Amino acid sequence: MPFGGLFQLTLESTINKSVANLKLPPHDVTVLRDNLKPVTTLSTITAYLLVSLFVTYFALFKPLTARGRVACFVLKLLTLFVYVPLLVLFGMYLDSFIIFSTLLFRFIHVGYYAYLYKNFSFVLFNVTKLCFVSGKCWYLEQSFYENRFAAIYGGDHYVVLGGETITFVSFDDLYVAIRGSCEKNLQLMRKVDLYNGAVIYIFAEEPVVGIVYSSQLYEDVPSIN
């Protein structure tokens, strides 16, 4: 097995150097290799497990900045069209297959939604679902409970999505559009004004009936006779 590849560990080169330095006879070399075979096998399995884990993490990684997303996209292209051919050139076929197939599958997966919605952001953000507000997109936050509602921080006639301030004129035009593997629109249902002048905009599929403050849960309300 050749030495090299992404996280590829091998004892072959060490064994060959040891055999050459010790000048062992052919019979002893065979015995040594047979004794070390379980170790080399375990090393090979560990190497490819590490390759698979790292490449999967790399394929699913989602940078939080615009510069990071572009850099990650370019790095994936370089990996596919520069690094993988180098691995093939040096005979590391299994490494190259794992890396190429994992990255290509992820590109096809997110690229399908980019083609479907004619929006390259799915590829750059490396996700199959995005939320859009006034044409600006961001990751679908975990706080968007099962895509049923969303709470976005902002102020008077603006919201903050992904660190970017998005202004709007009319409340009628403000809504959250979820696109990708899940498609729905969350309408603005409630505007909560905070003491510091900030605003929390609540978007949902169903109308918001009311908001209960935590202090009200234990409030002693006197009865009226």
Curated annotation (Swiss-Prot):
<dbReference type="GO" id="GO:0033644">
    <property type="term" value="C:host cell membrane"/>
</dbReference>
<dbReference type="InterPro" id="IPR004293">
    <property type="entry name" value="Coronavirus_Orf3a/b"/>
</dbReference>
<protein>
    <recommendedName>
        <fullName>Non-structural protein 3</fullName>
    </recommendedName>
</protein>
<feature type="domain" description="CoV 3a-like viroporin TM">
    <location>
        <begin position="35"/>
        <end position="125"/>
    </location>
</feature>
<keyword id="KW-1043">Host membrane</keyword>
<dbReference type="GO" id="GO:0016020">
    <property type="term" value="C:membrane"/>
</dbReference>
<feature type="transmembrane region" description="Helical">
    <location>
        <begin position="70"/>
        <end position="92"/>
    </location>
</feature>
<keyword id="KW-0472">Membrane</keyword>
<keyword id="KW-1133">Transmembrane helix</keyword>
<feature type="transmembrane region" description="Helical">
    <location>
        <begin position="97"/>
        <end position="116"/>
    </location>
</feature>
<keyword id="KW-0812">Transmembrane</keyword>
<dbReference type="InterPro" id="IPR046446">
    <property type="entry name" value="a/bCoV_VIROPORIN_3A-like_CD"/>
</dbReference>
<dbReference type="InterPro" id="IPR046445">
    <property type="entry name" value="a/bCoV_VIROPORIN_3A-like_TM"/>
</dbReference>
<feature type="transmembrane region" description="Helical">
    <location>
        <begin position="41"/>
        <end position="61"/>
    </location>
</feature>
<feature type="domain" description="CoV 3a-like viroporin CD">
    <location>
        <begin position="129"/>
        <end position="208"/>
    </location>
</feature>
<dbReference type="Pfam" id="PF03053">
    <property type="entry name" value="Corona_NS3b"/>
</dbReference>
